[in-house]
Amino acid sequence: MASGRDPREARPGELEIWDLSREPWDEWLRDMLEDINQEAKMHFGRELLFQVWNYCQEEGERNRTPMLERAYKYYKLVQKALFVHFRCGCRRRQPFEPYEERRDGQGGGRAGRVPPGLD
């Protein structure tokens, strides 16, 4: 403190996720989707994840959003849901059991493409 410098780390400027120079954006996003889907399957179940994926796809088709932006929107929604789930206290000790699946086999989340990591 004697030097007059602020001991806190300086806040970075406006940095967007696509500004990071790790690997191509689509490869990074695909890897992150696979990772987050593996974790989300244990807490939410596949059917709910399919429904969120289909919501993002349908919303993107209505707005003519590119596929990568739709996938990124799905990633952000699942990431926020996991954050809230853990923040509220996850009490799950075993992987998710699909106890609420429809018995006639007509689940609402299987139309269209499959999110990466859920095939």
Swiss-Prot record:
Subcellular location field: Virion; Host nucleus
Disulfide bonds: none
Pfam family membership, one: VPR
Alphabetically ordered keywords of this record: Host nucleus, Host-virus interaction, Inhibition of host innate immune response by virus, Viral immunoevasion, Virion
UniProt cross-references to InterPro entries, sorted A to Z: Lentiviral_Vpx_assoc_factor (IPR053711), RetroV_VpR/X (IPR000012)
Main localisation: virion
One GO cellular component, as annotated: virion component
Record Gene3D superfamilies: 1.20.5.4730
Gene Ontology BP annotations: symbiont-mediated suppression of host innate immune response; viral life cycle
Further comment found in the protein's record: This is an African green monkey isolate.
Summary of subunit composition and partner proteins: Interacts with the P6 region of unprocessed GAG. Interacts with host VPRBP/DCAF1, leading to change substrate specificity of the CUL4A-DDB1 E3 ligase complex.
Biological role stated in the UniProt entry: Plays a role in nuclear translocation of the viral pre-integration complex (PIC), thus is required for the virus to infect non-dividing cells. Targets specific host proteins for degradation by the 26S proteasome. Acts by associating with the cellular CUL4A-DDB1 E3 ligase complex through direct interaction with host VPRPB/DCAF-1. This change in the E3 ligase substrate specificity results in the degradation of host SAMHD1. In turn, SAMHD1 depletion allows viral replication in host myeloid cells by preventing SAMHD1-mediated hydrolysis of intracellular dNTPs necessary for reverse transcription.
Protein name: Protein Vpx
Organism: Simian immunodeficiency virus agm.vervet (isolate AGM3)
Organism placement in taxonomy: Viruses, Riboviria, Pararnavirae, Artverviricota, Revtraviricetes
Gene (name only): vpx
